C-alpha cells in the first residue's frame, strides 16, 4: 500500500489491461515529446486509474493469480478527470524512459541541474540546449542525458524561464 493521502484503500481494486481509449490518452501524451517505445500497459483501478508499464509475459502470470496485485510493473502515471471534466493521462518522470524524446526538452548544466532537483526554477541563462515546439510542459535533462524532471516554460520571464513542476528530488524532500 502507498503511504500518504494519494489513495484510499477502501473498496476493491481492479487490475486490467488499458482500453484502446486509455492507450490513446497515453500515446497522445508521449507524442508531445517524441515516440512511445512501449505498447503494453495495465490499469489498477481504485479511487484513481493508475497506469503501469508491464510486458506481456508478466501480464500472463498476473492473469492467472488468484489474488490481484495492487501494483505491477513500473508505475508511469495516472488517468483522471481534470477540472474541465476532460479525461487525461498525467505521466510521472519514469514514463519518459519509455519515450524516444525528440522535442520539447531542455538540457541544463551541472549547477542548474542540481538546483532544479532541489525544487528551484530555471533562469534562461542556465539552459544549455532547448528544443521547444510550443508545448507548455517540457522535459528537463541534465548534461549527462538523465531526465531530472518536468517543467513549464515561461518565455516572457528570463529569471523563471522554466518553472519546476516535478523533479527527481521530490521524494527526498518529503
Curated annotation (Swiss-Prot):
Transmembrane feature ranges: none
- Database matches in InterPro entries: NIP7_N, PUA_sf, UPF0113_PUA
Q: Which Pfam families match?
A: pre-PUA_NIP7, UPF0113
Q: Which GO terms describe its molecular function?
A: RNA binding
Q: State the similarity comment.
A: Belongs to the UPF0113 family.
**Name of the protein:** UPF0113 protein PH0281
Organism encoding this protein:
Pyrococcus horikoshii (strain ATCC 700860 / DSM 12428 / JCM 9974 / NBRC 100139 / OT-3)
Amino acid at each position: 500500500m502507498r503511504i500518504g493521502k494519494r489513495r484510499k484503500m477502501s473498496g476493491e481494486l481492479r487490475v486490467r489491461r488499458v482500453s484502446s481509449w486509455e492507450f490513446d490518452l497515453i500515446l497522445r501524451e508521449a507524442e508531445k515529446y517524441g515516440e512511445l517505445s512501449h505498447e503494453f500497459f495495465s490499469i489498477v483501478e481504485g479511487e484513481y486509474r493508475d497506469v503501469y508499464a508491464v510486458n506481456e509475459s508478466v501480464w500472463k502470470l498476473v492473469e492467472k493469480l488468484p489474488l490481484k496485485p495492487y501494483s505491477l510493473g513500473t508505475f508511469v502515471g495516472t488517468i483522471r478527470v481534470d477540472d474541465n471534466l476532460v479525461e487525461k493521462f498525467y505521466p510521472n518522470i519514469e514514463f519518459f524512459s519509455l519515450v524516444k524524446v525528440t522535442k520539447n526538452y531542455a538540457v541544463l548544466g551541472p549547477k542548474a541541474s542540481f538546483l532544479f532537483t532541489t525544487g528551484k526554477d530555471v533562469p534562461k541563462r542556465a539552459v544549455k540546449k532547448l528544443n521547444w515546439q510550443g508545448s507548455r510542459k517540457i522535459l528537463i535533462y541534465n548534461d549527462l542525458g538523465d531526465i531530472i524532471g518536468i517543467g513549464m516554460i515561461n518565455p516572457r520571464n528570463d529569471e523563471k524561464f522554466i518553472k519546476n513542476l516535478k523533479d527527481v528530488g521530490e521524494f527526498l524532500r518529503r
